[in-house]
Amino acid sequence: MKDLLNFLKAQHKTEEFDAIKIGLSSPDMIRSWSFGEVKKPETINYRTFKPERDGLFCARIFGPVKDYECLCGKYKRLKHRGVICEKCGVEVTQTKVRRDRMGHIELASPVAHIWFLKSLPSRIGLLMDIPLRDIERVLYFEMYVVTEPGMTDLEKSQMLTEEEYLDRLEEWGDEFTAKMGAEAIKDLLGSMDMHAEAEQMREELETTNSETKRKKVTKRLKLVEAFIQSGNNPEWMILTVLPVLPPDLRPLVPLDGGRFATSDLNDLYRRVINRNNRLKRLLELAAPDIIVRNEKRMLQESVDALLDNGRRGRAITGSNKRPLKSLADMIKGKQGRFRQNLLGKRVDYSGRSVITVGPYLRLHQCGLPKKMALELFKPFIYSKLETRGLATTIKAAKKMVEREEAVVWDILDEVIREHPVLLNRAPTLHRLGIQAFEPVLIEGKAIQLHPLVCAAYNADFDGDQMAVHVPLTLEAQLEARTLMMSTNNILSPASGDPIIVPSQDVVLGLYYMTRDKINVKGEGMYLSGPAEAEKAYRTKQAELHARVKVRITETVVDEDGNSTTETKMVDTTIGRAMLWQIVPAGLPYSIVNQKLGKKQISNLLNEAYRKLGLKDTVIFADQIMYTGFAYAALSGVSVGIDDMVVPPAKYTEIAEAEEEVREIQEQYQSGLVTAGERYNKVIDIWASTNDRVAKAMMANLSSETVVNRDGEEEQQESFNSIYMMADSGARGSAAQIRQLAGMRGLMARPDGSIIETPITANFKEGLNVLQYFISTHGARKGLADTALKTANSGYLTRRLVDVAQDVVVTEHDCGTHEGVDMMPHIEGGDVKVALTELALGRVVAEDVLKPGTEDVLIPRNTLIDEKWCQIMEENSVDSMKVRSVVTCDSDFGCCAQCYGRDLARGHLVNQGEAVGVIAAQSIGEPGTQLTMRTFHIGGAASTAAAENSIQAKTTGTVKLHNAKFVVNKDKKLVITSRASELTIIDEFGRTKEKHKLPYGSMLSKGDNDAVTAGEVVANWEAHTMPIITEVAGRIQFVDMIDGVTVSRQTDDLTGLSSSEVTDPAARPAAGKDMRPAIKLVDEQGNDVMIPGTEMPAHYFLPGKAIVNIEDGAEVGIGDTLSRIPQKSGGNKDITGGLPRVADLFEARKPKEPAILAEHTGTVSFGKETKGKRRLVITRDSGVTYEEMIPKHRQLNVFEGERVERGDVIADGPESPHDILRLRGVHAVTQYIANEVQEVYRLQGVKINDKHIETIVRQMLRKCTITHAGDSEFLPGEQVEYSQVKIANRNLEAEGKEPARFERELLGITKASLATESFISAASFQETTRVLTEAAVSGKRDDLRGLKENVIVGRLIPAGTGFAYHQDRQAKRAEAQEGPSAEQATDNLAALLNAGFSSDE
């Protein structure tokens, strides 16, 4: 019987498939799906509950209501399988066919499909080249359209109103035909010759010169081509037959009380059938035209509502006033088919419960309540009971389990042994949100979680819940164990740092254990080893913190794995010596011979992992945790109010600050400072006071005076509980202690501006009512922010995953020589991120040479690991080219060499690793930690005064980069170029500092001069931009007429006069076209030339420039001719945090972007218009390029200056699109990576650059064809980059001309929608638009990405699935050639080995 059922089930097995194609269905196709026509709108008989014949639930069409039983009951049981009952016409089969048998409705008049009509751009409108409004008028019976002009002067597809039509009828009679409604459109579409249209448009493209026309024609041509290639017939966009959904997918269920609950679709179908039947009857009766027309219009509207309710006109509403859910609504949105049922499903064998701590567990274990385990492992228990012969049937086994007999618990123990379970905590923001553990049965009802995995789950025990899932098959258990076990996930995939790091209590315990104290019992003892140290401590002969000498044995393991031991006496403490007992062999003692804070412990685990491998590290981590908990308990650290010591200096500091504020207030009242300055100064005073109080408080807390053995007083670190917690990194920070014992300081209003009266009290002293009220402001804003942040961050992650989901490592090496240049991140005087940290885990793209020589230090294609990093440090390498995902040459996905090290595993990435999803998770997961707000500059944020000099922080050599300068009479260098940089390098040639040099800076050091730390290297004026002469001579003013182009002012106090150039807009008419300038002449009055050029030294003065020198004065080289006051920089809001990251990945253009030079050449200015300046760049070839620039933009270039392509002409935030166009892929990658990192670094979040590069690769996956060559592409068409690459490769192989193209940068939302796979795009956003487009162009989805495969229910082509898919393709290739003798054994171990090389 069982076999028979299985056989029946197997009958409808579909063959394996490799791609899914979507297209338009022809009427015949719809009829071929159908099992009969639905003729009546009836559903079921309300008395008998039987479906009506020919109705929407008809059993004859859709199949029986009960398994193997016809409707009238004549045939029952399996033996009549396949019989069709002659009485009621129902086939005897399973009920479930009612889920897949469709019906159809023959429409009495054709109806346009609303998706192809209204989904923009309207496909029908575009194809026929008629505006949508006109087509709608025809469809909804307001106008006639000419379908056959005959011998008349009418044109085909010309619109006629009712009157015009009647006039023409009188004139021509039946010479011509004009119709209205969908039949007219159908006729027109049917009479179109696609090939002829395409030919005609191609000719049009070649002859036309207008850009708009070309764009329009290209669009239409693409659509026509799509129809030709896909074999879709345009007529099929008009429906003549309507398919009917299987009834079980639109159920009708009787509720008690004689009412029915029904799917909205049934209502919509009933409307269509009613109107269709009425129309048929009207046509039979030959009713008047106007009635028929009205009925046809209503039919069109009802079909529209069925397909996509609310797309046109008002949505049809049901009885309860809400719009009915149409077919389109069923699939789109969060509750639609895609996101609700296909991408995320609920699963059996899962449970959830509250979590509590399991401090005694091992890292790979979790505590599972017995009750839960019994329920989850039921099937396993049943089968065990049966095989043991303890229960005869499954039913008996069930009874035994329900009675909870003693034997059941023994069997549960056996079943659970080494059967991992998955624990998941929502929200699962990265892959460590689901990990596998071995269950340990416990009493109680809460799941116990190992404390060290809390960081990965971001879990705490304040009532969090977690879900448990049971992997059922052997394969699933194997994967859970080898890939998902918590012991295999020690490193974070985002940064490669350990994520199993002790926190809180454990840190505090270890910190307390490794601190030292002066002059306590046992100080100065000599001990023979850690064991004796422990003995001394246990017998109370020495205290835990006593400074002692201990004999220590270290093990050193060299690269070949040979170990040598070394014994020495070490100055240490009892606690550290005891801790040494649990440290595995192979680590140096120095690593624990220090006070261990959170950072040091993390480093300790990292070292252990890199040197000793996974197994030892895991055991060590557990030991650390047990030890930490034990000593945290022994330490007795607690928080008491007396631990918060308020520094006595606080009160004097506050008094002084109040005095200063009073002075400023007086200055303001007497008009010496403006309101804004007063506000900023007051805030500065309070900010610095707060810092000083905090310093005094920390100094007070952090040290105490004790008497040492010699009776002298000595300072030692304090054992104050609060200080210890903050210092160890267990809990709290200096900023929080400052609020407890210093002063709370300045508070912000919800809009981000700072309230100028600070809270001078702290929590120990207590706040008064006003202070309390002020502080609630910020706190409430914080909570509101958090809620918004979570949603925003989640949406960002979703977009990132969607754009990157199909990046999988597909091959070992793509063979490219490309790469990106790596340099250390240097800001001002600090190396923010060292080169070794950036290059770690990357593969070298070009041989790295030993600095200053031609010797190869690191050969090409080397994976940089910790050993190489050390070599780089020793040889002071300061730049290198590494391979990157962005430049990877693989056609699909990327290759292992370009990706480099798998951060979570520490070796070269495996093929099949889903690096795209990991990148998206790594960027999205910390999203909730980023801030939401735009920072307003004001108050504390602008405490840094405007920079006006560079002071060297390191000793070394000065280097100038792309700097032009002149030497003035004081022998100082004056910079006359824009994007100059000054760097200071150390004796090894490593860059230590990097500074921007503004135009007009005075340098006291030249190129290659030595400099010592603390010297001022350059200075400039902060608030003005000078104009500097590059030649000496006499001044002559040009066009500088007082009262017209300049206004003179004389200072009353000094008697000095200066002229200010008036803004062109504010000049009288006479001065509009004048261009005030200063020119330099020699003694004879001839123009002086700028050295090295043929250009006279003319300096044009922009509006607002101030000139302090007189006409005819003598000037020397490097003197300042005029000053342009700069708007004090940076009162713009800086977008920070999450919105900034989103802007970068969406590649949004900034409001006023920087203007970059489009070409290399010499700058001059042409004729100005009302609001714009004309910038002209003359290239070396003499070709000029012009660009209009708004007058209010501050330009960085002067007449006659030379610029390089991509140089900044006007300041502002740079647009990534411009960077890509002018400076290329590398520059844009670097820009996005640096800007994103900036935001994350501010929050102290570490993310590896390769994740950001992976996303950038996906943003760059489209390109625009500029020249088609011999390819199939159209110029101006946007094509997938990989497609162009493949096409060009084939063209080059045939010796034809390849297509030329420009890379495009798309934002992540756009890039997700522009993906090759329509299934993936449709499940992301704008489902209707995506599906319409895909259907018209007959798209084929090759199921390459992960998402498409999840949706169609196959193994994903990543991880173990990658090997499976490769295997399948190989087998199919074989099968096509002819079956080979030995069929490859599809064995799981082979798959696992092929897909993964785990460390274990």
UniProtKB/Swiss-Prot annotation:
Q: Which GO terms describe its cellular component?
A: DNA-directed RNA polymerase complex
Binding-site list for Zn(2+) 1: 70, 72, 85, 88
Q: Which residues bind Mg(2+)?
A: 460, 462, 464
Q: Which residues does the annotated region (Disordered) include?
A: 1367-1400
A GO MF term: magnesium ion binding
Q: Which residues take part in binding Zn(2+) 2?
A: 814, 888, 895, 898
Q: Which CDD domains match?
A: RNAP_beta'_C, RNAP_beta'_N
Alphabetically ordered keywords of this record: DNA-directed RNA polymerase, Magnesium, Metal-binding, Nucleotidyltransferase, Transcription, Transferase, Zinc
Cited SMART domains = RPOLA_N (SM00663)
- One GO term (biological process): DNA-templated transcription
Instruction: Give all cystine bridges in this chain.
Output: none
Q: Give the catalytic activity.
A: RNA(n) + a ribonucleoside 5'-triphosphate = RNA(n+1) + diphosphate
EC class of this enzyme? transferase
Q: Which domain of life is it from?
A: Bacteria
SUBUNIT field: The RNAP catalytic core consists of 2 alpha, 1 beta, 1 beta' and 1 omega subunit. When a sigma factor is associated with the core the holoenzyme is formed, which can initiate transcription.
Family, as annotated = Belongs to the RNA polymerase beta' chain family.
Q: Which HAMAP family match?
A: RNApol_bact_RpoC
What is the name attached to this protein's record?
DNA-directed RNA polymerase subunit beta'
Q: Which organism is it from?
A: Vibrio campbellii (strain ATCC BAA-1116)
Taxonomy of the source species: Bacteria, Pseudomonadati, Pseudomonadota, Gammaproteobacteria, Vibrionales
From the UniProt record, report the name of the gene that encodes this protein: rpoC
